[in-house]
């Protein structure tokens, strides 16, 4: 079976790997000169299998109003003329109920838990290295209100058997001794021991190298223009003015996936959430984090690499704008100085921004479409790397006619389509 994958970020690359391992003839196309150079380039560095939550949560609408007037707000909305932005925000607000939050979080935890197992198996079989650590995530709560609000998340963790430990303020330094050098006061913390860290770009590019050795063809520097279709199937993809064909197609273009589907009559509610990061050289390892620390107040993660600290977070609903906002850099620097003062050389930090492909309910869109030979793998939001291996393995199983190893309810695009849309019949490969 010939498969054409559109996009070579972490999602497209992991999908290519699993399809190649299944015996498929895989080609990956991307406009960049290498894999992992857009949203995968400098994300927060977290593999957050335990800390998996949708942005659409109870209380967020009220907080969003308050954040409009805060300098270091974790979420900001900059209206554009794109009506899809308004539609996406409206759908997100409808998912901010306790009932919808519980359903959406459960779906996300289910996929993240499976993805952890897939990643561990991948590392064991390939020896893939990406400055990874397996020391967990420590989520910091600055207020008792934040600590109390975590109770619902803990219930979901317990339901799915995800290990966790609640920490008193005195216990936090056992996992992150560098925090003792800062002056921030904490009400407590939640430690998730199975979470991991690493450099997503290194992971993506080194996995692309392994995939190439396994027979995958990567075609870089090529512009994907449109999908051609007839009779309920994709007949090819226009790439740099020529038609490229395959037996089946996978769309893994992140925030840009929705535009390509419009000509098919599919309205995919995936919209960019702009995030920022700083990558800081370490000057004092004793003052630096040992793994990932997540500041609940500012929704910012601080992650330790070998000789660097990656500080990332925040979300701007601002369309496809990739300009660097100096106010966001100031927020990242403020959090670093508050929690780990003197750990890194901020003057040498690399400031970056990327567009995370987000759905209104937080759950990605992975699986079949109304077009018999078109599959989607997008919409992972801030958790693309966390869910990448599980999403890629599940999609490979689905496309090969194998029974997936997890419950796939609510993962595909049909949860957003009208009841008149039907799932196409497919023969096993």
Swiss-Prot record:
Enzyme class: oxidoreductase
GO molecular function, one term: D-amino-acid dehydrogenase activity
Catalytic activity, as annotated: a D-alpha-amino acid + A + H2O = a 2-oxocarboxylate + AH2 + NH4(+)
SUPFAM superfamilies: FAD-linked reductases, C-terminal domain, FAD/NAD(P)-binding domain
GO CC aspect terms: cytoplasm; plasma membrane
EC number from the UniProt entry: 1.4.99.-
Pfam families per UniProt: DAO (PF01266)
Gene name per UniProt: dadA
Residues given in the record as FAD binding sites: 3-17
Record's function text: Oxidative deamination of D-amino acids.
InterPro entries, per database record: DadA, FAD-dep_OxRdtase, FAD/NAD-bd_sf
Domain of life from the UniProt record: Bacteria
Gene3D superfamilies the UniProt entry points to: D-Amino Acid Oxidase, subunit A, domain 2 (3.30.9.10), FAD/NAD(P)-binding domain (3.50.50.60)
Requisite cofactors: FAD
UniProt keyword annotation of Oxidoreductase present: yes
Protein name, UniProt field: D-amino acid dehydrogenase
Family of this protein: Belongs to the DadA oxidoreductase family.
Keyword entries, A-Z: FAD, Flavoprotein, Oxidoreductase
GO BP terms, alphabetized: D-alanine catabolic process
UniProt pathway annotation: Amino-acid degradation; D-alanine degradation; NH(3) and pyruvate from D-alanine: step 1/1
């Amino acid at each position: 079976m010939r498969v054409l994958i559109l996009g070579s970020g972490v999602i497209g690359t992991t999908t290519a790997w699993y399809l190649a391992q299944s015996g498929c003839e895989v080609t990956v196309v991307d406009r960049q000169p290498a894999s992992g150079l857009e949203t995968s380039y400098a994300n927060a560095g977290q593999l957050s299998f335990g800390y998996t939550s949708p942005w659409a949560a109870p209380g967020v609408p009220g907080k969003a109003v308050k954040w409009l007037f805060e300098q270091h707000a974790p979420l900001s909305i900059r209206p554009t003329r794109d009506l899809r932005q308004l539609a996406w925000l409206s759908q997100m607000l409808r998912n901010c109920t306790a009932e919808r939050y519980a359903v959406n979080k459960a779906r996300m935890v289910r996929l993240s838990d499976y993805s952890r197992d897939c990643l561990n198996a991948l590392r064991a079989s390939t020896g893939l290295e990406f400055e990874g650590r397996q020391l967990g995530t420590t989520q910091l709560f600055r207020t008792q209100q934040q600590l109390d609000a975590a109770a619902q998340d803990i219930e979901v963790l317990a339901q799915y058997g995800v290990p966790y430990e609640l920490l008193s303020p005195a216990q936090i330094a056992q996992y992150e001794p560098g925090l003792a050098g800062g002056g921030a006061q904490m009400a407590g913390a939640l430690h998730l021991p199975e979470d991991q860290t690493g450099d997503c770009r290194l992971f993506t590019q080194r996995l692309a190298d392994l995939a190439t050795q396994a027979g995958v063809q990567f075609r870089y520097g090529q512009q994907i223009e449109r999908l051609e279709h007839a009779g309920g199937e994709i007949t090819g993809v226009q790439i740099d003015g020529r038609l490229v064909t395959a037996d089946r197609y996978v769309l893994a273009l992140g925030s840009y996936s929705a535009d390509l589907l419009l000509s098919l009559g599919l309205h995919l509610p995936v919209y960019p959430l702009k995030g920022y990061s700083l990558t800081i050289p370490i000057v004092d390892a004793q003052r630096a984090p040992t793994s990932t620390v997540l500041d609940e107040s500012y929704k910012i993660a601080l992650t330790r690499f070998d000789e660097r600290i990656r500080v990332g977070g925040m979300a701007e609903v601002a369309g496809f704008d990739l300009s660097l906002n100096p106010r966001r850099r100031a927020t990242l620097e403020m959090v670093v100085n508050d929690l780990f003062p003197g750990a890194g050389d901020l003057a040498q930090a690399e400031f970056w921004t990327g567009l995370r492909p987000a759905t209104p309910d937080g759950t990605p869109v992975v699986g079949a479409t109304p077009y018999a030979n078109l599959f989607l793998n997008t919409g992972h939001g801030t958790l693309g790397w966390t869910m990448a291996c599980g999403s890629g393995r599940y999609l490979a199983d689905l496309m090969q006619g194998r029974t997936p190893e997890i419950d796939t309810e609510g993962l595909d695009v049909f949860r957003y389509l009208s009841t008149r849309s039907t799932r196409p019949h497919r023969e096993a490969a």
